Amino acid sequence: MGMSKAERIAALLGSLKKENKFEQIANVIDKVSIKESDQIREIVPIEEWINSEYYCGADGVKKLYPFWKDLICDIFRDGKQNYNQIVLTGGIGTGKSTCGLYIVLRKLYELSCYKNVAGLFGLMSNTMTAFLYFSLTKYQAERSGFAQLRSIIDGIPYFKERFQRNKYRNSTLDFPENIRLFYGSSTADMIGMNVISAIIDEANFFGDSSGSEVDLGSVEELYNSVLSRTSSRFTSNGVNNSLNLVISSSTFKTSLTSKLYDKSLTDPSIRYARARLWDIKPQGTYKNEYFY
């Protein structure tokens, strides 16, 4: 049995030093306000989860290519999250954006198996845990990846029966435990938020193949801000629990994806995956064809 709240307060007050007592008392109040988290459901192993219509929906099981399923299993293998940064790149039609959404869904699912999610990370119980989907404009985000994410969630039995969102709001996805999914277009949309996970789909920031409509450096600046915020909020006991994704088409050669590729060669926290159509499509799709 652990100590009662009164016993915890007494023990903490008894440890105070004479100097800076008011500051120390404020710290005591913060500590007793942080409740521990309890696991309320067993977390289904990733290999079972990704092939279950109950957890991923019929579309996830039947339409997510094996290439991406294998990647998702690698990210969450052995019952833990093995990377903090995921870079998905490849040609149009390879399913990389959809894969990114299912990676985020796995993170959401794992959090849903706990009571007092904030306590997992040493945060106060009323702390909001936020996910963000970024696009060039909020309007574009709402009608692209965020809308797809909402549609996927609404078709999954688990999120209908065990962890249901507020169906009266579609501009954000509000779940129990003060977990919320937002969309945004700039660093300003993160102000005041405890962001645990974000997706930046680079293709949404470009008007054409040259990327001339937006300063490509601003995308890198946004991503660096995301990394800083997520790691500072959700690093607990030396473990970084954040999960951030960059999704980029092979059409675009950007400094961000190039830098992340170079970093991935030596940084074990980054997973870089490049999909080619002949890797993705079912065997026989390109029979007797050659690629140069």
Predicted regions and their residues:
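Phosphate/NTP-binding elements of NTP-utilizing enzymes
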Residues: M1-Y292
